[in-house]
């Protein structure tokens, strides 16, 4: 479950990878039958308004750090990703799901709403209509449904999940590292801009990369028909 302690561990992990320039990606998964099955309800029950808001803002801060980090986060969802578990998965850049995975935001059944960004990230990922349906019914959706609505990038058999996630990470690591980081940043920040402003932003970043050493190596490698050495 997603306790304040687990959130703090995730926060520390983000600190660690950001302090190490050699780390370009981070795979988030669970060794259990659930990815994250939600929050600790017994712990939440004892919170007053101030504590509840503090808990919500902690989740917001950490998940926003994931989104704003140059590191690429891959969520390998191996089972239930409910409530805060789905909110954690949505903060990842890419989600790959085991066939048995189930996703949902059941908070309204507790008289609550998602508190770690679920009301906002879900509609940005799958559209407001589908997000309202998932939230207001509190239904769990299957991995295939998640793939269909764009909440997952790929669905695989459970025993292949980590292998497939690692293969996906290897593809990302083979890219120009600055290019991959810039892709993430331009897509994230461009989503909140008007289309003309976003296109201008893209052109600026494209031209900046174009004159850099990564592009020099990548273009030469292509013309010389050899793998690029970034």
Regions found by a protein language model. Give the residues of each.
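Glycine-rich phosphate-binding loop at the start of an alpha helix
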Residues: 38, 53-56, 60, 83, ...
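Conserved CoA-thioester-binding segment of acyl-CoA-metabolizing enzymes
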Residues: 1-29, 46, 50, 57, ...
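C-terminal long alpha-helix characteristic of the crotonase
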Residues: 16, 96-101, 143, 152-200, ...
């Amino acid at each position: 479950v997603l306790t304040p302690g687990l959130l703090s561990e995730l926060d520390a992990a983000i600190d660690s990878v950001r302090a190490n320039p050699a780390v370009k990606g981070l795979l988030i998964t669970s060794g259990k039958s659930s990815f994250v099955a939600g929050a600790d309800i017994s712990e939440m029950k004892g919170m007053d308004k101030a504590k509840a808001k503090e808990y919500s803002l902690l989740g917001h801060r950490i998940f926003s750090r994931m989104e704003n980090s140059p590191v690429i986060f891959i969520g390998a969802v191996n089972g239930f990703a409910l409530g805060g578990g789905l909110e954690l998965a949505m903060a990842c850049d890419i989600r790959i799901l085991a066939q048995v995975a189930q996703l949902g935001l059941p908070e309204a059944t507790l008289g609550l709403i998602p508190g770690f960004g679920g009301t906002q990230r879900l509609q940005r990922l799958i559209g407001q209509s589908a997000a309202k349906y998932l939230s207001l019914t509190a239904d769990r959706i299957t991995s295939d449904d998640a793939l269909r609505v764009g909440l997952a990038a790929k669905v695989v058999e459970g025993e292949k999940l980590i292998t497939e996630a690692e293969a996906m990470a290897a593809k990302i690591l083979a890219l120009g590292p600055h290019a991959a980081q810039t892709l993430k940043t331009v897509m994230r920040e461009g989503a909140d801009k008007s289309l003309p402003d976003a296109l201008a932003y893209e052109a600026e970043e494209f031209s900046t990369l174009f004159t850099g050493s990564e592009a020099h190596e990548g273009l030469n490698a292509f013309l010389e028909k050899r793998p690029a050495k970034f």
